[in-house]
Amino acid sequence: DKLQKFQNRAARIIAGLSYETNSADVLESLGWETLESRRQRMKSVFLYKIINDYTAPNLKQSLMGSNSMPSSYILRSTDTDIAFPKPRTEFLKKSFKYSGAKLWNSLSREAKEAQSISIFKQNIGR
């Protein structure tokens, strides 16, 4: 949150606008994303790479684990979601396995079934 405020202030200075100007408008005029949207986009790309075997196999095994369907089922069936357990703690909600699966499941089917990273990036925006 502090870092986002810093980015907003820097954007206003670069754009030569006053502090009263809406930060979302300033970021949009500069073509900047919020830090949160950038994090989500980068996490989505990383998940795509994990699921489609562009990373070390242990990452996919760790993400899919025993709480999930086999990857062959996920990628070849009509259901492209990652199964994940209901979190019992805040710690689990903040884990990459949980938040990543939740993010992946929120993506469009078109994005999840993209044939390349560049197509995936186009499908998730930006």
Regions found by a protein language model. Name each.
Residues 1-126:
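Hydrophobic/basic alpha-helical segments
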